[in-house]
Structures are given as C-alpha cells and as structure tokens.
C-alpha cells in the first residue's frame, strides 16, 4: 500500500544562510521551480482551480504581483504561495517555512485553544485569565467564528473544517494573522466573545505579548497521570486489568530502515511491543483496548500492519479496507524511493513512464507489504490473532494526520470504534509527501504524489471521518476540561 513519510521531520525548512537576504530574482527563480515541481509531482494540481489553464493563470498573476514589489522577502513569497495553495486543501503540499528564530514583532494573545467536536475552547491561559478556562470561542472582532474560519480558509492549508479549526487554534491570536483576516486591524488589543461554562456570553479585550519569557507563565489544562504519554507506551489503567491504554504519538519505529536519518531515535519494533501488550491482556482476559492517537502527525503507515495482524490475524489480510490509492510517478518520487523507471517497471511487470499512475491494492494480502523488522513474530501466529479484546477504541483529534489517520481508519474498518474529535485529515484527499529543495534558498518543500479515496465522493464522510463516539461540551466540563478528557470518558463508559 502507501508509504507515508514522517511528516514532522519534513515540515521544517532548512536554509543555508540568511533567507531574507536572497535577491528578488533568486526568489522568483525559486518560485518558478516550486510550481514546475508541483506540476510534475502532484496527481491533480489543476481541478481545484477550474482546470490547467486557470491554474497557470493564477500562478502567473501571483508571479507578476511578486515581481512588482519593491523588495520581496521569502516570508512574503511563502505567505502568498500558501494562500494560492489553500485552494488544494492538501496538507501534504506546501512551501516550507525557514527555521530562523521567531520574529520579535510576532505577538500573541495570552490564550491557547483546543478543538472539541462542538467548536474551539480555551485550554491554556495566563494566570489572570483563569476565568476563561474551558470557555467556547464565539466571535473575533465582532464576527462569528464561522465567518472568521471562512476567511482563514483562504490563507492557510487545511483538508476539512476540523483541520481548519486546528489551524485557527495556532494562528487566530497572532497579530500578523489578524491583519490578514481583518485588513484594517491595527490595535493593541483584540476583542473576542466567549460562551462561559455557565452559558453566558462574555466579551473580552485581549492584549498581545511578544515571544519571550512571558510564555513560561501560561497555565495549561491538566493531564491525567494514569495514562501513558510516550510513544508505544502501554499500561493497564484499572486494578482489575480490564482496560489497557496504549499511547502512539508518532507512527515511527525501528522497523523503518535507517530511521536515524530522519532525526528519530527509537528501538521500538511494532510487532514486538504489540505482541507483549496483547499477551499481557490475554493473561488477564482483558476486555478493552484503547489506542490513543491524539496529537499524532503521522509517519510510516506500513509499520502498523504488524499491529493489525497481531490483533486480528488473517482476517486483517483478507479484509478489503476500501482505501483506494493511486501514485503518480515523477523524477522526484523515483529519487525519494531510490529507484528507477526500469527497476519499477520490472517490479510491476509492465512498462511505466513518467506521469503514469500506479494503483495500490486495498487488501494487504501479503507480508511483503509489511514494514517489519522481525516478521518471525508474525509467522509464529499461523494466521491466528494473538488476542482480540472484545472492545477496541481508537482516540483521535484534529492533529491525527497522515499515517496516524490511516491507522485509525484501518482499525475502524476492522471494527474498532473511533472516539473523540474528527481528524484534520480528509479520507478522500491527496497523500504522501515528495520532498524537494528550492535551488537558491535551499528551502525544503513538498508536493503530494498520490490520490487517496476511502469513500464514494458523495459519501457524508468523504471529507471528515466522523467518530462513533463524540464527547459533548458537558462531558469535557465534567473532567474539568482535562487534556485527557476522552480517555477519562472511556474508562467510565
């Protein structure tokens, strides 16, 4: 099936020297290179713009606009390109941002936000704003949140409404973003209306603070120490050993060849850790497994096949997952996978050329598709599951993305219940990053190389995988808006 690279490792651009000192001509050369690569790599860069002609027209118009500026900076170019790319609603395609220090002029309101099924709530605050804990955001500068989100959708990249709300959480309190949302905004405070825990609306005028030591004073909603927090850490959370919780905050393990090259240090082998956990559950005849995928930005989908095989045995390999995946062949994709057209054609048993699409199977029928460092663990099962608990829950939030979304989706197709907040990843979307570097700035960028379809295009979940169980605002309130509200809810479920 698909190979989804660890997205967090790719999101940070690496610049040689000072990006802001690059000449306008050099930046425009990078602009041209970016869009030439996008057209070669991306499976469909045109449809969102109304066709190839309109796409090229918009790219040309933006280039002319950038060329007409007196002094063009990389930040300005990236911001404009991101606005244009927002039409794709593709979280794997981006012109990356550089790794220079945060600008002093960046200022933020002293609040942090979180997405719940009903909207956006406050889950971090400076001490004097404690009264806003758990308050629901309703308006910004006199405009409804829905209206503000519609504006934000035109300047950031997101795949569905929940992903857009996730972007709002990290950007809506920033002065530079507010100026883009409200062109005439030039104030020392921003007005926001909140619905308080008691149901009353409160208008608050919030000041801005620059990057610096102030942010150490932010108070966050609490986490519950009963639950594991490290990657692939697991533990029973009840005295009777009936409920096991595993935390997976990155789909990355030692199963990935040369994992250290991605800046990741781990000795976890998925087949090994899942086998140990399931055997512990089997000894105690445990009835419930909770897999926590919140905050998981992705990684390598194929390392999780071993976990599903250990949970479900040969039934996993006989199940049509309904995930249709089509990959476009490009020079950059071949380079990423360290192969050639000749070798690829041989492995596929047919002649392939650049621009062709390869269809991947929706049934994982062979261990050949597994990325597993120790398949002997799986072979010893002889098709039988190690242990299948009566109830399996997988917990998601807006940050459950890419390979983490795939994991949640596959578990759901196998019968697990999805719990929490919908993923910001659309089921029907573009997928997989193919990285490339801009020649002058050295900036790391990416274009999707595949089309993914989990549902018919008119299916109500084509853009948003709706969880089977979603908490109400009152459910969150009952946990004092704990960061682990979904897990607390489940162990009481």
Q: What kind of region is each of these model predictions?
A:
Residues 1-21, 34:
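Bacterial Sec-dependent N-terminal signal peptides
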Residues 20-290, 295-325, 329-342, 391-393, ...:
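Flexible, low-complexity junctional segments that flank or bridge functional domains
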Residues 172, 363-381:
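Short N-terminal or domain-adjacent regulatory/targeting segments
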Residues 294-296, 388-405, 427:
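Active-site neighborhood of thiol-dependent amide/isopeptide-bond enzymes
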Residues 323-371:
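Low-complexity, serine/threonine/proline-enriched polar segments
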Residues 349-364, 448-470:
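Extended, charge-rich low-complexity interaction segments
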Residues 371, 380-395:
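Short, conserved helix/loop micro-motifs enriched in His/Cys and acidic residues
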Residues 402, 406-408, 412-414, 418-433, ...:
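C-terminal soluble interaction/assembly domains
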